[in-house]
Amino acid sequence: MNALLSNPFKERLRKGEVQIGLWLSSTTAYMAEIAATSGYDWLLIDGEHAPNTIQDLYHQLQAVAPYASQPVIRPVEGSKPLIKQVLDIGAQTLLIPMVDTAEQARQVVSATRYPPYGERGVGASVARAARWGRIENYMAQVNDSLCLLVQVESKTALDNLDEILDVEGIDGVFIGPADLSASLGYPDNAGHPEVQRIIETSIRRIRAAGKAAGFLAVAPDMAQQCLAWGANFVAVGVDTMLYSDALDQRLAMFKSGKNGPRIKGSY
């Protein structure tokens, strides 16, 4: 395989190695590059809840490219046209939100593969992913370097988890704590004992099926707990939340009555 198509994040998942990540919601290449120099194993560039355009995602991929931190793109949805765009700008690892059924998972896999294995539109000669046609045999090699992660974040998805795990081409399953707790009747309360029980059971089921298990935990103790349960790609913070907390904490040193750190909640 061409060295430009190597995907260290995927290789480490295959080996079962633990990878610690950070969520990027700030939408700027400048902040993304700062995060990339911090040493996180992976960086989630969020296109679902952060106001990122395709060009914003593109610039952030460029910003982190010189560093060891591996980018993961979360598009706003798993539609075929959007997946085509984020792959063409050079994303190798995708996290697709709100996947509730095995059929949805199969459709997402198909959207990432060129014919005859899928339905990805062909435009490698004008795509950063293929270095504008300079990677020889790009279409024949690229499938091995793509890493596809799906989010399970509803009761329906939990009911279908085993079938989703059976879908060929899915490398990992990410438990979405905020939406999941809301779907289970405990909004903004991923720490509820019943939600915690379901998260633990789900992580163990994912790993038992031979897939990677992921999670976002803004509270350090929750992150440690998920790692203990077997999750092997865990994001331990969100850049905008960390920035906001640092601002509040610094101001509280000089102004009475101001609050200190406020990081809490499911997300």
Curated annotation (Swiss-Prot):
GO molecular function: 2-dehydro-3-deoxy-D-gluconate aldolase activity; 2-keto-3-deoxy-L-rhamnonate aldolase activity; aldehyde-lyase activity; identical protein binding; magnesium ion binding; nickel cation binding
GO biological process assignments: protein hexamerization
Binding site for substrate: 151, 178-179
Keyword annotations from UniProtKB, A to Z: Lyase, Magnesium, Metal-binding, Nickel
Superkingdom of origin organism: Bacteria
Transmembrane segments: none
Effect of residue 74 to A: Loss of 2-keto-3-deoxy-L-rhamnonate aldolase activity
InterPro entries xref list: Aldolase/citrate-lyase_domain (IPR005000), HpcH-HpaI_aldolase (IPR050251), KDR_aldolase (IPR023593), Pyrv/PenolPyrv_kinase-like_dom (IPR015813), Pyrv_kinase-like_dom_sf (IPR040442)
Enzyme Commission no: 4.1.2.53
Record note on cofactor: Binds 1 Mg(2+) ion per subunit. Is more efficient when using Ni(2+) ion, although it is not likely to be the physiologically relevant active site metal.
Signal peptide: none
Residues at the site labelled Increases basicity of active site His: 88
Record-listed Mg(2+) binding positions: 153, 179
Any one Gene Ontology cellular component term annotated for this protein: cytoplasm
UniProt cross-references to Gene3D superfamilies, sorted A to Z: Phosphoenolpyruvate-binding domains (3.20.20.60)
Assembly with partners or alone: Homohexamer.
HAMAP family linked: KDR_aldolase (MF_01290)
Protein purpose: Catalyzes the reversible retro-aldol cleavage of 2-keto-3-deoxy-L-rhamnonate (KDR) to pyruvate and lactaldehyde. 2-keto-3-deoxy-L-mannonate, 2-keto-3-deoxy-L-lyxonate and 4-hydroxy-2-ketoheptane-1,7-dioate (HKHD) are also reasonably good substrates, although 2-keto-3-deoxy-L-rhamnonate is likely to be the physiological substrate. In vitro, can catalyze the aldolisation reaction between hydroxypyruvate (HPA) or pyruvate (PA) and D-glyceraldehyde (D-GA).
Name of the protein this chain belongs to: 2-keto-3-deoxy-L-rhamnonate aldolase
Gene: rhmA
